[in-house]
């Protein structure tokens, strides 16, 4: 039986109606500050928490509920005689329902130029303490941190007069997750203040479920999608406009495609399968970029993931509607484009903003995490070195830079053949580099003649250059750094190939 409830919330969504419902059920309400004002201004009877404690709010509101008459009322074990005697001796009222959510710390630190002092003042102390007390004593007390529960709680109280034990346990679990995520946000903010960088002494993060997925990489694997609490970027901020629910593999491929297409400032299109590009292209129009990307490997494009870095127009949509695609993602779609694409009921249309730079990548391993900064180093042609007798032409330079931006997104060992506007062949994930080169060159076919080749890491031997020469490759870009670089340079010189060393490796595992 719930007789007394304590309400103290920062997010006042639904709190007035909830308080009204509690009062109608005969529950006595105690409240604090702005919550009390909102309730009483609505004509609902509620008592200030001072009527419990005998102490006023003090120190600019820092001390309101940190009092034995509050926490004794929450933490007392109801069927423990000693606890009951202590309550009677000290005039402590039992508190059966605690409704609390916390100061808006994440929202505060998200403001531009927020001061440390302002951030500190938005660290809640009394709130988490009440939440944890009530969650600990969930056998007797209900703890509510999410306004979404208000209606169902009122319904349960009307029907049963109390909250079922199993339901209180679920609320307690949610409450501990709520305070844990809150503390993670504070610790990470302080890490930033201390300039601890992307790899601090403790790596903390909190996530909330977006949705269950049909299955994982394979049908026998269970899966769900979670987003980082308090952030609004990347896959966690995607907006699905149309189509079936996303799968695990869709989201993995979408991440790869989205990072790839934003390598370019010109209109660009990338088509992805298993995180590797079937085709990628730039052009003066989005339509032409997509057509070129599709024609790079029209067989593999079937059932692919398409990423575009411009608003999708009707002409591009019409072209994409001609084949089966799993996902199309872009920063926006025109109404005309949506009308065309939504005629295909299963295709997933995703709207998403440009990726933020300076993020970290995290990989779960048994018993730990691997954390690294993203492979988004800013590169400049001026820092590259031409190591062959033949210099690249300006057209070849453009092709080399195009290929170099893409090859880092291909699974190692990675070889990519292109001209200055589109991919021609991609060799991914082979255990030796010359094997990847053979795949890419075979895919490029006759188009390899006069094209360029990019390699994500150095050539351990001269055989890759020799293979490229047989197919007519005109220029090569690679990191260099092998103890046998001279073999590759000699092979390039003998074939009249221009070769550029970047001194930067781009492995992708």
Predicted features, each with a name:
Residues 197-413, 420-423, 433-437, 442-447:
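Long, structured protein-protein interaction/assembly regions in large complexes
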Residues 3, 16, 92-227, 238, ...:
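Internal alpha/beta core interface subdomains
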Residues 137, 141-149, 267-278, 419, ...:
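Glycine-rich phosphate/pyrophosphate-binding loops
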Residues 8, 75, 98-103, 144-145, ...:
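Short beta-strand segments
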Residues 13-18, 22-69, 73-77, 82-93, ...:
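Feature captures the catalytic cores and cofactor-binding loops of soluble hydro-lyases/lyases
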Residues 5-13, 247-249:
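Short, glycine-rich nucleotide/cofactor-binding loops
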């Amino acid at each position: 039986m719930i007789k007394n409830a304590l309400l103290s919330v920062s997010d006042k969504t639904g709190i007035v109606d909830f308080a009204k419902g509690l009062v109608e059920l005969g529950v006595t309400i105690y409240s604090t500050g702005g919550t009390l004002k909102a309730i009483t201004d609505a004509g609902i009877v509620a008592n200030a928490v001072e009527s419990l404690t005998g102490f006023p709010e003090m120190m600019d509101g820092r001390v309101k509920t940190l009092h034995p008459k509050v926490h004794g009322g929450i933490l007392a074990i109801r069927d423990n005689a000693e606890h009951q005697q202590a309550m009677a001796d000290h005039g402590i009222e039992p508190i059966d329902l605690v409704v609390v959510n916390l100061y808006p710390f994440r929202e505060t630190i998200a403001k531009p130029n927020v001061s440390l002092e302002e951030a500190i003042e938005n660290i809640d102390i009394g709130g988490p303490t009440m939440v944890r007390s009530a969650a600990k004593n969930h056998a007797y007390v209900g703890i509510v941190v999410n306004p979404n529960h208000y209606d169902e709680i009122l319904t349960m109280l009307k029907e049963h007069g109390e909250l079922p034990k199993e339901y209180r346990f679920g609320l307690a679990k949610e409450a501990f997750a709520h305070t844990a995520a809150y503390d993670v946000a504070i610790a990470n903010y302080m890490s930033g203040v201390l300039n601890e960088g992307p790899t601090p002494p403790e790596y903390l993060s909190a996530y909330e479920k977006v949705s269950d997925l049909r299955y994982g990489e394979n049908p026998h694997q269970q899966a769900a999608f979670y987003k980082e609490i308090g952030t609004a970027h990347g896959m966690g901020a995607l907006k699905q406009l149309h189509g079936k629910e996303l799968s695990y593999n869709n989201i993995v491929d979408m991440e790869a495609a989205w990072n790839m297409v934003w390598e370019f400032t010109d209109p660009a299109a990338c088509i992805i399968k298993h995180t590797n590009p079937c085709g990628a292209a730039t052009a003066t129009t989005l339509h032409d970029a997509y057509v070129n990307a599709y024609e790079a490997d029209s067989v593999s494009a079937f059932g692919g993931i398409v990423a575009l870095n411009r608003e999708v127009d009707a002409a591009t949509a019409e072209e994409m509607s001609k084949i089966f695609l799993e996902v199309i993602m872009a920063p926006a779609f025109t109404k005309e484009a949506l009308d065309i694409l939504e005629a295909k009921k299963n295709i997933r249309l995703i709207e998403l903003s440009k990726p933020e730079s300076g993020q970290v990548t995290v990989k779960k391993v048994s018993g730990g995490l691997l954390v690294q900064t993203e492979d988004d180093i800013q590169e400049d042609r001026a820092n590259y070195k031409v190591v062959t007798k033949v210099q690249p032409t300006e057209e070849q330079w453009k092709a080399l830079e195009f290929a170099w931006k893409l090859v880092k997104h291909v699974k190692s060992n990675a070889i990519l053949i292109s001209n200055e506007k589109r991919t021609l062949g991609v060799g991914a994930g082979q255990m030796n580099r010359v094997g990847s080169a053979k795949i890419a060159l075979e895919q490029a076919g006759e188009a390899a003649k006069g094209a360029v080749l990019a390699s994500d890491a150095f050539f351990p031997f001269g055989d890759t250059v020799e293979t490229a020469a047989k197919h007519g490759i005109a220029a090569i870009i690679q990191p260099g750094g092998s103890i046998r670089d001279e073999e590759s340079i000699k092979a390039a010189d003998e074939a009249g190939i221009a070769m550029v060393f970047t001194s930067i490796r781009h492995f992708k595992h």
